[in-house]
Structures are given as structure tokens and as C-alpha cells.
């Protein structure tokens, strides 16, 4: 029920203005009656104030001792004043393990703010996060590369219009090293390609460069060294990528059609150069036993019974990795009967 568009009547018949707190004299009466021992429901009926309103006023009074209403409308006053923020930062710096609610209690104990006007726990956490972001930004600025300069202009820069960066792309400035810095870095790289943190720290102090810049330089230098080594191998051995093709009738090759008893003597020097254990794995006997013409069929074992024990690799890879090794394609008993030979075996020359 509305009266004059301002006041309203509650269920008990009392008048109130919607959105406005109770007058101070009514609040004082509620507290006085509660001190005398009257129950909240009896106070509500006596003063014609809703039971919820009486309970909230008494609860706030018992908790904080404040009887006046909170701020009405307008902007909320800032509780985290500069003095409070400075004290929060000091407490967190002295005691990093403090929680936000402990900081709130300490602020109230020191008298910087009252119980009802202390910053909330979420507000204190917000202040702490902002302080951490400021510290991280400060350290990032301190650790940024000190020697940064734009790239050197080209000789034809006078006749060409300067080109700006493309929109939406960011370009990093290249670090220009002095001759002394480049010489010190290169000398340390020749000593070891993977320096530890102690060596990087000493090198950074000696060259007046940030440690991050030293670490990036070593990473780029290792990549450049790998490219140079790969180019050198390709230049020295242009045919390394091609598989070796050896005729079947060449010495040291035993064809699949030859019987074990008809092994030519030209094939035996290759086997004699191998370790006896290697020949034992492949042939079931050492070469001196298999070289006689009276060798029985039991003297030789098929390759597919012991192929898992032998090293297998392609010729191009092994020639690149170990130039001292030579590869020989084996055309006998590879992978079992009926399969084409395509595997190479290694032995020392």
C-alpha cells in the first residue's frame, strides 16, 4: 500500500520509506529494548518494524558496535587508501606467508582502519596481485638487453624510401656486439658449446651483456655450427646419399643360388677379416672351419635364424656417421628365401 508515493506500510502497520534506512532514534530504541532483554520478535511488534530489519541492526551492532547506517547511495568510499596499501605491501614483504585475512586483522589492530571500514579480503588480494605485477614489470625492465640498436643502414639507403613495419607485425631490434664481445663469446664457444649457468654468468659479467642475451647467442651459434657441419659433409662426399651398388659376381659376395659347400675362396677373405664371433652369428662356424670342402650342411646356419643379432644400417647413413667403416651388401639369405636383398652389413676395413 502506497501513501503519497513515498511511504509504505509494512505488515505490522508501521511506515517506512523504501530504500532509506531507519531513523537513528528508532535504532536506538531497538538497541535499548534488546539490552533490557526483550526478544527481537517482541521488539518488532512493539515498534512496528519488520523482524528482519531488527535482526540485521542488532547483529551489526553486536558484531561491530556501530549503530549508524552505512553510506546511502553515491560512490563507495575507497578503503584501500595509499597509507593502507603501503602497510599491506610492507607486511607482505616482511611476512610473505601472511594470508589476506591476517593482514586485515593486523590493520585493524594497528588502528589504520576501523572494523567496519577495513578493506575486504578480496580487496587485499587485489592489492597484492597488483604489487606482484608491478614487481614483475620492474624486473623485466631491468633484465632487458642493454645494448640494443637498429640495423646498420645499407649503402643504397639514400635512394630508397624507408620502409616501415607492416601493420600488425612487431619487429625486434638486433643486438649489435662489439668486436671484444664477439671474440669472447666465440672463444668460450670453442671451449664448450653448452655452458652452464656459472659460465654464462661470468661471461655476461665480462662482456657487460645480459645473461639472456648470452644464452640466445649460444643457441644461435650452435644452430649455425650444425648448418656448417652438414654443408661440409655434403661437399666432401657428394655421393653419400646414393646407395652402393656392388655386382653379384664381385669378390666377397655369396649369391643365394650358391650352396654352402660351393663357397668360393674369394669370399673367405672378407669373412676372415671379421670377428670370429660375428662369423659365428652369421654362418654358425668360424671361417677356418667353413673353408674346407668337406664342410657339411650343418656347418652353416641360415641368416634368418640370427638376423636380430646383427647390426643393420643403410650405406648412406653409416658412411656419413662413421667414414672409417665400409659397407658390403649381402645377397645371400637376406630376410628368408624369396626376398630381394636390400640390406648392408658393416665390417672394419
From Swiss-Prot:
Annotated coiled-coil segments of the chain: none
Keyword terms: Developmental protein, Differentiation, DNA-binding, Homeobox, Nucleus, Paired box, Repressor, Transcription, Transcription regulation
Gene Ontology MF terms: DNA binding; DNA-binding transcription factor activity, RNA polymerase II-specific; DNA-binding transcription repressor activity, RNA polymerase II-specific; double-stranded DNA binding; RNA polymerase II cis-regulatory region sequence-specific DNA binding; sequence-specific double-stranded DNA binding
One Gene Ontology term from the biological process aspect of the record: negative regulation of apoptotic process
Region (RED subdomain): 83-131
UniProt region (Transcription repression), positions on chain: 278-349
Distribution of this protein across tissues and organs: Specifically expressed in pancreatic islets.
DNA-binding region: 5-131, 170-229
Job of this protein: Plays an important role in the differentiation and development of pancreatic islet beta cells. Transcriptional repressor that competes with PAX6 in binding to a common element in the glucagon, insulin and somatostatin promoters.
Family: Belongs to the paired homeobox family.
Name of the featured protein: Paired box protein Pax-4
Organism in which the protein naturally occurs: Rattus norvegicus (Rat)
Gene (UniProt): Pax4
